[in-house]
Amino acid sequence: MYQDKILVRQLGLQPYEAISQAMHNFTDMRDENSHDEIWLVEHYPVFTQGQAGKAEHILMPGDIPVVQSDRGGQVTYHGPGQQVMYVLLNLKRRKLGVRDLVTLLEQTVVNTLAEIGIEAHPRADAPGVYVGEKKICSLGLRIRRGCSFHGLALNVNMDLSPFLRINPCGYAGMEMAKITQWKEDATTDNIAPRLLANILALLNNPPYEYIAA
């Protein structure tokens, strides 16, 4: 019988394609009794092109690979120092619509940043989370058979310069930000637990369990 427990995997630094394949496999294999999972991971440098992605938004990738993804949205960059959180949730079971999940993820990041003194907000016209006009977190989701995968990417203490090689999320001149511009001692190690605590709170504090990678 299904129990409302979320399994949390802290996966460290991983290549994007291997984790993407694992997400697909998990989503394809899961059934109505499978636990929901949250994966916390950082990726080696990679540009990922979303389903709606247009090639003209990849300006000069250089030595960084470009990988096609089936998440929503346009091109973005992942690299070390960016906390990625993948949400593998049975939305039907949790009575969440897609828009509800987007709002929940944005609020997770807003609440996490508020705890460390950074005022952030979502934008109606461009998904993600912003500090002033600068984008600090990107979102991209896919829903299959009522279950979500992919998730969010929060810039913590990463090198932002690769974002200059693309139009982030399809917006020319979109300025990116990272947490260490306001909070110098931020690392993925001290941000990940806050991010997890905040998403669990918004999911009504289900029991959770860390699973060894």
Swiss-Prot record:
It catalyses: octanoyl-[ACP] + L-lysyl-[protein] = N(6)-octanoyl-L-lysyl-[protein] + holo-[ACP] + H(+). The keyword Magnesium does not apply. The record marks 135 as: Lowers pKa of active site Cys. One of its GO terms (cellular component) is cytoplasm. Keywords: Acyltransferase, Cytoplasm, Transferase. Residues 32-207 form the BPL/LPL catalytic domain. GO terms for molecular function: lipoyl(octanoyl) transferase activity. Its main location: cytoplasm. The active site is at 169 (acyl-thioester intermediate). Its EC number is 2.3.1.181. It is an enzyme of class 2 (transferase). Substrate binds at residues 71-78, 138-140, 151-153. GO terms for biological process: protein modification process. InterPro entries: aa-tRNA-synth_II/BPL/LPL, BPL_LPL_catalytic, Octanoyltransferase, Octanoyltransferase_CS. Pathway: Protein modification; protein lipoylation via endogenous pathway; protein N(6)-(lipoyl)lysine from octanoyl-[acyl-carrier-protein]: step 1/2. It is found in: Cytoplasm. In the reaction, the free carboxyl group of octanoic acid is attached via an amide linkage to the epsilon-amino group of a specific lysine residue of lipoyl domains of lipoate-dependent enzymes. Belongs to the LipB family. Catalyzes the transfer of endogenously produced octanoic acid from octanoyl-acyl-carrier-protein onto the lipoyl domains of lipoate-dependent enzymes. Lipoyl-ACP can also act as a substrate although octanoyl-ACP is likely to be the physiological substrate. This is Octanoyltransferase. The gene is lipB.
